[in-house]
Structure formats: structure tokens, C-alpha cells
């Protein structure tokens, strides 16, 4: 098992768009990609996350892994990887997000959560770990995760989309925790679960 430190908001790799994974003419993927994917799964599992983008552990590649239910009330989860994802969504609501139903967290903003409006439905197309075409879609929590992870790969954190008092609360939290600077990370399994009880 290989667990990597998770970068915290302020690290440049989180705020830079990732590069597509290069696919060879024969359709094969880079030989070292399976090792990265394995580390991503191990890290996500150790952190109790529902998704993890490669740049969250310092790799500027367009890859994310997930282990996520359709919604918070379900125990059945879907697990997978998407390489070079392209996101499609339904319309994003223009109303103020509901703090009771629209809260979102991020492993790169450990222990914090803020309400954010997201599309109710999302789909990503890309490649699986073997280089085969893959499409995955969902609603609710699963759609939120797809939007969140592809946002990471585009160089954005969910904090970048917060509005009003929620954006101000996030700025205060970052300042009080002394985040927002390069080089900060946390190690899943070595510190208490930041989203746990």
C-alpha cells in the first residue's frame, strides 16, 4: 500500500490545469500510470474520500479516482478511474446554495465544508486504466463528485466557486488555519480523519 500526502489549498499544483495523459498510437497508456492510479486509490481510501484527483497528490495529470454512492443515504458505491475526463452537466442552479443540502468538502481543504451549487446530473467520458473508452454518469452526490474532481483537474478548488457569505467564511477559515501558501500537505492515516467524528 502506497499512501501519498495530500496537498492543501495554496499549493500551486492545485491551482494549475493538469496535462492530458499521453496515449500512444497503439492506444496504450504510460507504463507508470498504473502505479500512480494504485497510489491514488490507496490515498483516497486512507483519507476516507469519495474522489481524488492526481494533482491533489502532486501529479499534474488529468486523472481522477472515485469510490462514491449516488447519494448519502445509499451504501452501494461505484468505484473507478477516469483518465482525460470530459465533463457534461445539466444546468447549474443560480440560487444561493442550501447549507443543509449543498455542503461539500475537499481533501485539500481538510476538515472544512461549505455550501456550493452544483448541477443535479453529470457525466464524464474518458479512458479507464486499460485505455478503453469509459463513460460514467449520475445524479446527486455522484454528480457532485464528478464535477468536483474534474474541477480539480482544471486547476480549481470548490472554494473558487463559492458565493456570498460562504466565500467569506472560506477565506476566514483559510486564513485562520494559515493555509493558502505553497508546500502544505497532510498524510492520511497519520493524522485523525479531518472529516470524521
UniProtKB/Swiss-Prot annotation:
Belongs to the polypeptide deformylase family. The keyword Iron applies. GO terms for biological process: co-translational protein modification; translation. Binds 1 Fe(2+) ion. InterPro entries: Peptide_deformylase (IPR023635), Peptide_deformylase_sf (IPR036821). It comes from Mycobacterium leprae (strain TN). Its EC number is 3.5.1.88. Coiled coil: none annotated. Keywords: Hydrolase, Iron, Metal-binding, Protein biosynthesis. This is Peptide deformylase.
Amino acid at each position: 500500500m502506497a499512501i501519498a500526502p495530500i496537498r492543501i489549498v495554496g499549493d500551486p499544483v492545485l491551482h494549475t490545469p493538469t496535462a492530458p495523459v499521453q496515449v500512444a498510437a497503439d492506444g496504450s497508456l504510460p507504463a507508470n500510470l498504473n502505479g500512480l492510479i494504485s497510489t491514488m486509490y490507496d490515498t483516497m481510501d486512507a483519507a476516507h474520500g469519495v474522489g481524488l484527483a492526481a494533482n491533489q497528490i502532486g501529479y499534474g495529470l488529468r486523472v481522477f479516482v472515485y469510490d462514491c454512492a449516488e447519494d448519502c443515504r445509499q451504501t452501494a458505491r461505484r468505484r473507478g478511474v477516469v483518465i482525460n475526463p470530459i465533463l457534461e452537466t445539466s444546468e447549474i442552479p443560480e440560487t444561493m446554495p442550501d447549507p443543509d443540502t449543498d455542503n461539500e468538502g475537499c481533501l485539500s481543504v481538510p476538515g472544512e465544508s461549505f455550501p456550493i451549487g452544483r448541477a443535479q446530473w453529470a457525466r464524464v467520458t474518458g479512458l479507464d486504466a486499460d485505455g478503453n473508452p469509459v463513460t460514467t454518469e449520475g445524479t446527486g452526490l455522484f454528480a457532485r463528485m464528478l464535477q468536483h474532481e474534474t474541477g480539480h483537474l482544471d486547476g480549481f478548488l470548490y472554494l473558487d466557486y463559492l458565493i456570498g457569505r460562504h466565500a467569506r467564511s472560506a477565506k476566514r477559515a483559510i486564513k485562520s488555519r494559515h493555509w493558502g501558501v505553497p508546500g502544505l500537505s497532510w498524510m492520511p492515516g497519520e493524522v485523525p480523519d479531518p472529516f470524521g467524528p
